[in-house]
Amino acid sequence: MNLAVRDSVSADPNAEAAVRTALRDNPDGVLEAVAAAHSVTYRSVLDCLPAENAAVASKDKFDRIWDDLTSWGDVVFIVHTEDGVFETACTIPAGTHARGYFNIHGDSPLGGHLKIERCAAIYFVDRPFFKRRSCSIQFLNGEGQAMFKIFVGRDEAKNLKPEQVARFEKLRTETASKGEA
């Protein structure tokens, strides 16, 4: 993969090698920090993860993935920007498409309106984060940045919920592959 071609920013010709080295040297670090340090998009960093750590699904799979997530129970919904990281533990409510938005509604702290046509790809990410396994489904926009992320929940002992890990792995197998979305 040539990051200079894939990114909207002009990347260093050696950026891919530098990103891969950073990921190898610090496999459980913050991916947004890797992107910033190497002047590449977040998506480019995801694309440099080993195949066992990231698989990509087409944006056309959004409804299938979202519908499945509504039956997982409590997960962690995260929005990570340069200005902060916002997270809430919640169930994923059902949604409907209307007036150019995917409208989220239901008995959950999570509600709102997504411009889902801006979703360019959906990544299934399974990697260590601060020395613990972390599984997430990440929705990326056309600029290569994360719109939001949905993480498999943890129990009181901070272990991933095994039933959600099984659902994550099954959904990844059914909808994603390593490579272009």
Predicted feature residues:
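Eukaryotic intrinsically disordered, low-complexity regulatory linkers and tails enriched in Ser/Thr/Pro
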Residues: M1-A181
